[in-house]
Design a protein with these regions (language model features):
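Acidic/His- and Gly-rich active-site-bordering loop/insert found
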Residues: 1-106, 127, 131-132, 331
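Metal-dependent amide/peptide-bond hydrolase catalytic core
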Residues: 7, 24, 54, 170-171, ...
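Short glycine-aspartate micro-motif
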Residues: 75-77, 103, 163-167, 188, ...
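Short beta-strand segments
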Residues: 79-80, 139-141, 166-169, 190-192, ...
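Glycine/serine-rich anion-binding loops at beta->alpha junctions
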Residues: 86, 102-116, 197
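Acidic/histidine-rich catalytic neighborhood of metal-dependent amide-processing enzymes
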Residues: 111-182, 379, 383
């Protein structure tokens, strides 16, 4: 297996250059579809049936593929996303580049590299005849970087028919996978008061910005009392138009994270209580939002799956580890359904969402070999 993977390293780099050099920001539907078509062509060549769904009002391209009959359980689901955070035109400014150790470019780590790890694993399994014994589903969406609003139900529907889910977000430096992620969401606070001349008759005003200031302190107090299970941070505040006018409107955006499913209810109850506890007479407060991504908590099935990864890695002489992270991924949705889920199947890399994002090219062969070896073991255990 390793010799075959080694022989295709130049092909992998060529594929990586091709995908990275496609602008595919979440609002660039044509770019996302171009990524999908690249993958569809290759998946069809190894016997996968493919379908490009257009989801939501915007028609977000989402690719599904499988090597078995539709409607049946799959042994493994490969999950990833084709969109990036970078705006259209970014590729022209800083296209794919590589030296002996690293590759750079828009989305190279998050997660064009991961898409290609998934593809090349499947091509290795096809070459070794494993796909005859193993059913694999592929779900690559096009809106993960903007919350997966159009594709969440689609992901969950496929995850329910999967025995395991491998998520191809980046692997962390030190070859660390992800077994646990915080859940997340957001809330918006809108305060409405009364404007007045700030110098002549401020007493006639009801200052919406002051109300938001009070609510910000209340949120921080909740954050301090949550005991690490949940966090809420005011990240954006807007209010007022001119310095001599008492503002009649103000708004705050709040980022929320939860460690456990049991942390969700207290967060929701706290934010729902805020409109009844205003501080500035004459100001009303409305709150909207939710915890939109459940936390990813490792269960017994996930830990057993991780043990298989450790075993195969040890046979390769590869040292791997796992971490918990505060960032969310679409793996949260699968894990919340009780499906054993491991994330970080992409290339080892870092600085995601930054202009100096990179992947370590030395991780290409071991990552493909490890995942393919795990899949081969799963196939053998079915016999």
């Amino acid at each position: 297996m390793k010799a075959y993977i080694d022989s295709r390293i130049d092909d992998f780099l060529s594929d990586l250059e091709a995908l990275v050099n496609i602008d595919s920001s979440s609002d660039n539907l044509a770019g996302i579809e171009a990524v999908a078509q690249f993958l569809i062509h290759r998946l069809a060549a190894i016997g996968f049936s493919t379908r490009l769904d257009k989801l939501g009002r915007r028609g977000v391209p989402c690719l599904e593929a499988r090597n078995g009959p539709e409607g049946e359980m799959v042994d493994v689901m490969f999950l990833g996303h084709m969109d990036t955070v970078f705006p259209t035109g970014e590729v022209e400014k800083r296209p794919f580049a590589a030296d002996r150790d690293r590759a750079t470019g828009p989305g190279v780590c998050d997660m064009k590299g991961g898409l290609l790890v998934a593809l090349h694993v499947l091509e290795v399994l096809y070459h070794d005849g494993v796909l005859d014994q193993l059913s694999i589903g592929v779900c690559f969406n096009g809106d993960e970087e903007v919350g997966s609003g159009s594709s969440r139900a689609w992901i969950e529907a496929h995850a329910r028919y999967s025995r395991r889910v491998f998520v191809f977000e980046p692997c962390r430096p030190g070859h660390r996978f992800v077994l646990q992620r915080k859940g997340g969401g957001g809330y918006t606070l809108n305060a409405r008061g009364t404007s007045a001349h700030a110098g002549v008759e401020p007493e006639k005003g009801a200052n919406a910005a002051v109300e938001i200031a009070h609510q910000t302190i209340a949120i921080q107090q909740f954050n301090d009392q949550a005991g690490g299970g949940a966090s809420a941070h005011v990240t954006v505040i807007r209010g007022g138009e001119k310095t001599n006018i008492i503002p009649d409107e103000a708004r705050a955006s709040v980022d929320v994270r939860v460690v456990r499913n049991s942390d969700v209810a207290p967060v929701e109850a706290f934010f729902q209580s805020l409109p009844a506890h205003t501080h500035v007479p004459g100001v009303t407060l409305t709150v909207s939002g939710a915890v939109s991504r459940p936390p990813m908590e490792p269960d017994e099935g996930t830990l057993q799956l991780w043990h298989l990864f450790e075993t195969r890695a040890a046979e390769m002489g590869l040292v791997i580890d796992h971490i918990a992270t505060g960032g969310c991924s679409d793996g949260n949705f699968a894990s919340a359904l009780g499906v054993p889920t491991i994330d970080g199947m992409g290339l080892v890399g870092g600085n995601a969402h930054r202009h100096d994002e990179y992947v370590e090219l030395g991780s290409v062969v071991p990552q493909i070999q490890l995942i393919a070896s795990v899949c081969k073991t799963i196939a053998q255990e079915k016999k």
